Amino acid sequence: MSSPKNEMYYSLLEWFKTLNLNAPHSDAESLADGVALAQALNQFAPESFTDGWLSKIKPGAVGSNWRLRMSNLKKVAQSVYDYYSEVLNYSLGDFAKPDVQRIAEKCDLGELERLLQLVLGCAVNCTNKQSYITEIMSLEEELQANIMRALQELESTRNASSSPEAGGVVSSLSRSSLSGILDGKALQEERDAMAQKCFETEKKMLLLIDEKTNLQQELQKLQQEVSRMEHSSTAIGDDGVSLGPVQTGSVRYNDLRRQLDLLKEELLQSEGAREDLKLKAHQQETDLLHMQIRIDELMKSSAEVTTLKDEVDVLRESNDKLKICEAQLDTYKKKLEDYNDLKKQVRILEERSADYVQQNAQFEEDAKRYANTKGQVELFKKEIQDLHAKLDNESSKNVKLEFDNKNLESKNLALQRAKDSLLKERDNLREVVDELKCGQLSSSSALAGNTVSTELQPLATVDKLQRLEAENKALREGQGGQTALAQLLDEANKRNEHLREQLKTANERILSLSHATQSDDPIFKENEFGKQIKQLMELNEQKTLQLEEAVTQSSTMQCKVTQLETNLAAREQEILAYDAKYRKCVEKAKEVIKSIDPRIASALDASVLEKNAEVVEEEPKPKMTVMEEQLMTSAFYRLGVNAQRDAIDSKLAILMGSGQTFLARQRQSAPRKSLSAMKSK
């Protein structure tokens, strides 16, 4: 028995079992994978839950990883919510969304009940809802009540944003259609039962009519026999014995009378049964007429239901159009707001564009100012590129020379080893030659000492001694040569083994190098490429660090340069003011000198034009006039201005040259030449 808590779940499960599905759907474990639910949704609304969507549901998730089941259930729940919102125009904001994780992991009946409730709503609102509603009405009354309660809960939890008119019409339609179908089905069953009863009563009536005719025939036969018996004087029985005349009080008369009474009683009973059957048939005919009238009324109500359904469809379409119009109105409102925002943004952008035009004009003026420096920068760039190319060539030449030097060193070492081996062989040969020389001297001295004694000895002994000495000499010479040859052979063998080892190592190295160069092993190549990439990344990091340092230095120096340029501009303005004052003073001095003595004025004009207002050294005079003092003060003032300008230029050169790279120093403008240098030129 199902518990009251999960009564609705079991009712929904019984309804779900009535569906014709390929996947198993008899219990909670079989529904936990979502395959049966997806197939049911595809059966309800194939235009929304398409076969492509059904193919995304993985069928082999039962009893395996619960995460696969959870992914299937997520897809099913999301598609159901989309169907309610997009197709049915339902908003399920207040309806508790089923927890698919609990269904997939623990087969929670409460969460599965919510999911089945949503699937039931899809079934009773699809295009073929009439067939599914009839299947629901074929269930037990308790199950029907639970299913209706589930539909009412689903309807009551709709969000207030959805139109209440459409929802009420849909719910009334579902209830009216359910009640109409229920009443029609009950009346159909009653009509079938009454028709069956009428058929049975007709059969009974026919049987009774047959019995009545048979009884009437038997009665006629009996009456004929009675009349025959009455007219006949004697009768013979079955055994051939005469029964005697039929008279009152006789045995035969009594028997016939008894049989006649029995037949009358049976006839009365059959007539009573016939009357009863007639009454029943009449009652059933009246009931049948009432049923027919009720069926006609139900047909009229079903026609009214269909008209109401058509009206509901029209209202639903109008509601959909109203929603579409409201959505379009909202979109137009949003577009209007966006249009106002865009207007504001356009105004802001126009203001910014005006500012940018002014900035662009300023930048063009600055570009015209710095056009001269660009040529110098390009020249310096070209020189730097040439120097880099020369540096690359020199580095490649240096690498080649280092490689040649290593080869020559290896050749030198090989020659040195060969030289050492040859020197050793020479020393060994010298020792052998010295030994041979010593052996020859000893043999010659022995022969000279024995010549005197051989003359006194007999010939046989002399011959024997000579023969023995010759053999001894030959043996000594052979032994000495063999030792020398053995030493030479050993040295040659050692040298040969050493050369073989060197050849072996060289061949192994050649094979390893050739294998390394011609190897197609991707792991080796990946290692080599990895090493090269690491080296390049390290170089790149170093270059980026150097570049960042250079950028920071350039930014700081740019700030300093801008400050110094502002200071320099202020100084130049001051110098121009001082120059104007100086010229005024000089003109006043000239006017004063002209007023005093025109000859001195002409001489002073010539000296000022030739040497730019420098003080002309003259012979010492006994007394200094006022004009001379004024000229000296003006010259001293001019000298101070020039000295100050030179000091500023030297400070600028020091600041611009310190802490900068070669390119940064070349980019800076050269300091102005002093007035004294210009004058000297």
UniProtKB/Swiss-Prot annotation:
InterPro entries: CH_dom, CH_dom_sf, Hook_C, HOOK_N. Residues 6-123 form the Calponin-homology (CH) domain. Keywords: Coiled coil, Cytoplasm, Cytoskeleton, Developmental protein, Endocytosis, Endosome, Microtubule, Synapse. The keyword Cytoplasm applies. GO terms for molecular function: dynein light intermediate chain binding; microtubule binding; small GTPase binding. The keyword Transferase does not apply. Pfam families: HOOK, HOOK_N. Residues 135-439, 482-584 form a coiled coil. It is found in: Cytoplasm, Cytoskeleton; Endosome; Synapse. One of its GO terms (cellular component) is endosome. One of its GO terms (biological process) is cytoplasmic microtubule organization. Involved in endocytic trafficking by stabilizing organelles of the endocytic pathway. Probably acts as a cytoskeletal linker protein required to tether endosome vesicles to the cytoskeleton. Involved in modulation of endocytosis at stages required for down-regulation of membrane proteins that control synapse size. Not involved in synaptic vesicle recycling. Required in R7 cells for boss endocytosis into multivesicular bodies (MVBs). Has a role in regulating adult longevity. Belongs to the hook family. The coiled coil domain mediates homodimerization. Homodimer. Interacts with microtubules via its N-terminus. This is Protein hook. The gene is hook.
